[in-house]
UniProtKB/Swiss-Prot annotation:
GO-annotated molecular function: cytokine activity; interleukin-1 receptor antagonist activity; interleukin-1 receptor binding
Gene name per UniProt: IL1RN
Organism phylogeny: Eukaryota, Metazoa, Chordata, Craniata, Vertebrata
Major location (coarse): secreted
Position of the signal peptide: 1-25
Name of the molecule in the record: Interleukin-1 receptor antagonist protein
Summary of the function given for this chain in its UniProt record: Anti-inflammatory antagonist of interleukin-1 family of proinflammatory cytokines such as interleukin-1beta/IL1B and interleukin-1alpha/IL1A. Protects from immune dysregulation and uncontrolled systemic inflammation triggered by IL1 for a range of innate stimulatory agents such as pathogens.
PANTHER family documented for this protein: INTERLEUKIN-1 FAMILY MEMBER (PTHR10078), INTERLEUKIN-1 RECEPTOR ANTAGONIST PROTEIN (PTHR10078:SF28)
Source organism (scientific name): Sus scrofa
Gene3D superfamilies documented for this protein: 2.80.10.50
Length: 177
């Protein structure tokens, strides 16, 4: 009996080692997370799309609606998430640029990110739901929130003044069907 318990424990440890990206979402004993696709648009109805390798927000109509980027999400903890696009192959990250924080897309596979890695913290966002809207604060840059400009077709970025009326930090965030 003791040998079978040891073998079972060893087998579980081995499988966790092999499939760390699938199990990084939750501690032992919980079902592993999977990447899920979400639609995102700001409270002014601007959707995200890619233009010249930059994520922008604008009003897409007619045949252009197919340009809308779905946001790939891997939950890390109840309110912490990794965000990506293109099947999780490009991930949103917060990096310091001078005195400002900058949002950038990095060619990293979202399922390779690990929740306890200090180097992966720049990819982590804190999801806060308030009624029908959601905001995303950078875990690496506290106080900096994912935002869109008031004008259409401008880059998606970060702001440290989420209450100011010059940037939009509230989004509708809906799982894609």
């Amino acid at each position: 009996m003791e040998v079978s318990r040891y073998l079972c424990s060893y087998l579980i440890s081995f499988l966790l080692f092999l499939f760390h990206s699938e199990t990084a979402c939750h501690p032992l004993g919980k079902r592993p997370c999977r990447m899920q696709a979400f639609r995102i648009w700001d409270v002014n109805q601007k959707t995200f799309y890619l233009r010249n390798n930059q994520l922008v927000a604008g009003y897409l109509q007619g045949p252009n609606t197919k340009l809308e980027e779905k946001i790939d999400v891997v939950p890390v903890e109840p309110h912490f998430v990794f965000l990506g696009i293109h099947g999780g192959k490009l991930c949103l990250s917060c990096v310091k640029s001078g005195d400002e924080m900058k949002l950038q897309l990095d060619a990293v596979n979202i399922t390779d990110l690990r929740k306890n890695s200090e180097q992966d913290k720049r990819f982590t966002f804190i999801r806060s739901d308030s009624g029908p809207t959601t905001s995303f604060e950078s875990a690496a840059c506290p106080g900096w929130f994912l935002c869109t400009a008031l004008e259409a077709d401008q880059p998606v970025g970060l702001t440290n003044t989420p209450k100011a009326a010059v940037k939009v930090t509230k989004f509708y965030f809906q799982q894609d069907q």
